[in-house]
């Protein structure tokens, strides 16, 4: 199935049903009073994360989702039926962005997680609601309010522990094939990898981690060269980045300059991503003698000002791969996922009609208070007595 990691959709919640103006009319019951019912609320639009999905391709074809309108109120105080909700299923790892405001509405990071993206309109009030001591036959009602309407951008971001960085043909896909059951395409030409892929690395029966392979970066990727930097977003949730460097490029390019290009493009994309833990991994050491490979790797690390540990591996032959994977596993166990995103309270998404009914009922109560004569005195008794005499 084709991998699609971005899609734009339109979501429209249902309008609220209108209130009803009606009066009770039955035999032997004159002046029965108002009995108009309220309308029904409009249906909502929800997002739901589903671990069985892995692409947004469905939403390249189906782009509009509309919830059902609430039914109007009826006589005999009958309330209209609520509109049916609409649930849109997306892959785990999808970020939902309101294109109108640029606001991130939520990240769908767990299976079964639900997110309200468009709230249905409030129901209108029937004339029964407006009955008071001074208005026994109200003829006013309110209409239902329109449902929310939003244009959303869905961004699928892979959930992985380890992310792979490097120039095209650095050996990223060969590495992920060597350590997992994933089988990305491998060939001797640039941009063999066109879409991100995931692999699960199982160290033993209880320990494993997920590694993400993305298409290679080239100079000017931030300006759109090559495949651009659109796939770097898939590394934002990774805990550690493995920067693969071809120690002996077949095209004769300088490994130091290649590494600097990757670092530069990373910083242009996001300072947060550039600040993530990054490990230097020299690949294809089987093409050189051991001593020559070690000497060349040391020279490259010094030229980059690299003072931390670095690794020498051959993804094709498996040399040094197992030790690297165990060190990655140890790092992941010692640095569990920080629940900063969950602990941080997301900004409240404002819906159009959150306080609509409360405000309406408060206004009605204020009108009743104004009509009520609460400054009773002896001068008012004549009026009351006269009414009773008639």
Swiss-Prot record:
GO cellular component term of the entry, any: cytoplasm
A GO biological process held by the record: ribosome biogenesis
Enzyme class, UniProt record, top EC level: hydrolase
Pfam families, sorted: GTP1_OBG, MMR_HSR1
Assigned keywords, A-Z: Cytoplasm, GTP-binding, Hydrolase, Magnesium, Metal-binding, Nucleotide-binding
Superkingdom field: Bacteria
GO terms assigned for molecular function: GTP binding; GTPase activity; magnesium ion binding
Enzyme Commission number(s) from the entry: 3.6.5.-
Binding residues for GTP: 166-173, 191-195, 213-216, 283-286, 314-316
Matches recorded under InterPro entries: G_OBG (IPR031167), GTP-bd (IPR006073), GTP-bd_Obg/CgtA (IPR014100), GTP1-OBG_CS (IPR006074), GTP1_OBG_dom (IPR006169), GTP1_OBG_dom_sf (IPR036726), OBG_GTPase (IPR045086), P-loop_NTPase (IPR027417)
Annotated region described as Disordered, given as residue ranges: 127-147
Obg domain ranges (all copies): 1-159
Biased composition (Polar residues): 129-145
Subcellular location: Cytoplasm
Main location as per UniProt: cytoplasm
Entry annotated with the keyword Cytoplasm: yes
Cofactor: Mg(2+)
Keyword match rRNA-binding: no
Residues reported to bind Mg(2+): 173, 193
Location of the OBG-type G domain: 160-333
Family recorded in the similarity comment: Belongs to the TRAFAC class OBG-HflX-like GTPase superfamily. OBG GTPase family.
Function comment: An essential GTPase which binds GTP, GDP and possibly (p)ppGpp with moderate affinity, with high nucleotide exchange rates and a fairly low GTP hydrolysis rate. Plays a role in control of the cell cycle, stress response, ribosome biogenesis and in those bacteria that undergo differentiation, in morphogenesis control.
Known partners and oligomeric status: Monomer.
Protein's name according to its UniProt entry: GTPase Obg
Organism of derivation: Shigella sonnei (strain Ss046)
């Amino acid at each position: 199935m084709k991998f699609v990691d971005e899609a734009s959709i339109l979501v429209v919640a249902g309008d609220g049903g209108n209130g009803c103006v009606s009066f009770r009319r039955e035999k032997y019951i004159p002046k029965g009073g108002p009995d108009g019912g309220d309308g029904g609320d409009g249906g909502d639009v929800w997002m739901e994360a589903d671990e069985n999905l892995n692409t947004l391709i469905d939403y390249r074809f189906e782009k509009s989702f509309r919830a059902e309108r609430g039914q109007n109120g009826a006589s005999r105080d009958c309330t209209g039926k609520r509109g049916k909700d609409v649930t849109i299923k997306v892959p785990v790892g999808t970020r939902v962005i309101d294109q109108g405001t640029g606001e991130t509405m939520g990240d769908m990071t767990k299976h079964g997680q639900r997110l309200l993206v468009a709230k249905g309109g409030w129901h209108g009030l029937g004339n029964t609601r407006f009955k008071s001591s001074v208005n026994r036959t109200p003829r006013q009602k309110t209409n239902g309010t329109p449902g929310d309407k939003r244009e959303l951008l869905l961004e699928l971001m892979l959930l992985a522990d380890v992310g792979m960085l490097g120039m095209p043909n650095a050996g990223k896909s060969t590495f992920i094939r060597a350590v997992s059951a994933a089988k990305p395409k491998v060939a001797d030409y640039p941009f063999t990898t066109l879409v991100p892929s995931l692999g699960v690395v199982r160290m033993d029966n209880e320990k494993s981690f997920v590694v993400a392979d993305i298409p290679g970066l080239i100079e000017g990727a931030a300006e759109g060269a090559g495949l651009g930097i659109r796939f770097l977003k898939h590394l934002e949730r990774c805990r550690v980045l493995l920067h693969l460097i071809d120690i002996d490029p077949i095209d004769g390019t300088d490994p130091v300059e290649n590494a600097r290009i990757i670092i530069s493009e990373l910083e242009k994309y996001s300072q947060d991503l550039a600040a993530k833990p990054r490990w230097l991994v020299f690949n294809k050491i089987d093409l050189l003698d051991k001593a020559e490979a070690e000497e060349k790797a040391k020279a490259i690390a010094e030229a980059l000002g690299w003072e931390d540990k670095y690794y020498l591996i051959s993804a094709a032959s498996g040399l040094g791969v197992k030790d690297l994977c165990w060190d990655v596993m140890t790092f992941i166990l010692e640095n569990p996922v920080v629940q900063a995103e969950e602990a941080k309270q997301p900004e409240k998404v404002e819906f159009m009609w959150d306080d609509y009914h409360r405000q309406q009922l408060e206004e009605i109560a204020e009108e009743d208070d104004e009509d009520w004569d609460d400054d009773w005195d002896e001068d008012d008794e004549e009026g009351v007595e006269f009414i009773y005499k008639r």
